[in-house]
UniProtKB/Swiss-Prot annotation:
Residue positions binding Fe cation: 185, 262
Protein name (record): Ferrochelatase
One of the record's GO cellular component terms: cytoplasm
PANTHER family: FERROCHELATASE, FERROCHELATASE, MITOCHONDRIAL
Keyword presence, Iron: yes
Top-level enzyme category: lyase
Function, as annotated: Catalyzes the ferrous insertion into protoporphyrin IX.
Length: 309
């Protein structure tokens, strides 16, 4: 068996899971860098209690759940129907399905292969490293003997970027804006200052896409969303950019592969009340045919795969 596991943070599928998501996220040492495990757990509990009601109210506006799990499951289902060499499934970091239950679904031996596919185009310790570490620890804990490989970050991949360009231009044909905003999930500046590659990768990715789209837009803006708390985060804020923009714009959520609360609610609903200009949101790759083509190409390419340590 060749088992491909998509890795993501996950999204709450009901209002009760909002608390589970927050508790697990803020108890992640890559998110909340408190070395003492008990102190980190206590601080995570405080933050969760302070934020859970607001998160639940936001989720109610999306129908009570994030679309992330359903879209990822749809992606897996379509890929499993499209071919029979690989079996596709997914693991979330902060809400079910977790690594333990997914790995227990399969009987794996030395002749089998697990391919870990983080659904993050850019590297960050808060996403890629954290997800891979959890999976590799669980594989070791369950004494699984299968060979483990990972798909490397893919923001430079030509197929992936041609897909993005195609999706952007398809939306532009219906909403003719001259400004394109690339909105990336923000990170605290302190994480970047410790050597995290995320900001560099996002900047490099924007330059690649600008070159491909330079004949279609007059202006490109990189902005960052989803800031939390009083510490310094990557800037400018997407909300501030929209509040000060006079001309209509398109937004592409450059750091997301699957639509989630950050795209559907934050970009699609919340910022509408802050924006001076009219804007439209481009969907993430989700379960599109082009994204599936990129995925199958990646897992079949030895250049895209590396053996995990």
């Amino acid at each position: 068996m060749k088992l491909v596991l998509f890795l993501n943070m996950g999204g709450a599928t009901n209002l009760q899971d909002c608390e589970v998501f927050l508790k697990n996220m803020f108890n992640d040492p890559y998110i909340l860098g408190i070395k003492n495990r008990f102190l980190r757990k206590f601080v995570a509990w405080i933050i969760t209690k302070a934020r859970v009601k607001a998160m639940q109210e936001n989720y109610k506006k999306m129908g009570g759940k994030s679309p992330l799990n359903e879209l990822t499951q749809s992606l897996c289902n379509k890929l499993n129907l499209k071919q029979d060499e690989f079996k596709f499934d997914f693991v979330n970091l902060y809400v079910p399905p977790f690594a333990t239950e997914i790995l227990q679904k399969y009987t794996l031996n030395e002749s089998d292969e697990i391919i870990l596919f983080p659904l993050y185009p850019h590297h960050s310790c808060t996403t890629v490293t954290s997800s891979l570490e959890v999976l590799q620890n669980e594989i070791s804990k369950q004494k699984i003997q299968a060979k483990v490989k990972t798909i490397d970050i893919f923001y430079k991949n030509e197929l992936y970027n041609e897909m993005i360009v195609s999706h952007i231009l398809a939306k532009k044909s219906k909403f003719d804006a001259k400004i394109l905003i690339f909105s990336a999930h923000s990170l605290p500046q302190s994480i970047i200052d410790k050597g995290d590659l995320y900001e560099k990768h996002v900047n490099d990715h924007v330059e690649i896409l600008k070159e491909k789209l330079k004949d279609h837009f007059d202006e490109f803006i990189l902005a960052y969303q989803s800031k939390l708390g009083p510490v310094k985060w990557l800037e400018p804020n997407t909300s501030d950019v929209l509040a000060n923009l006079n001309d209509k714009a398109l937004i592409y959520p450059i750091s997301f592969c699957i639509d989630c609360s950050e795209t559907i609610f934050e970009l699609g609903m919340e910022y509408k009340h802050l924006a001076k200009c009219d804007y439209d949101l481009i969907s993430c790759p989700n379960d599109s045919d082009e994204f599936m083509e990129f995925i199958l190409n990646s897992i079949n390419s030895p250049l895209a795969r590396k053996t995990s340590c």
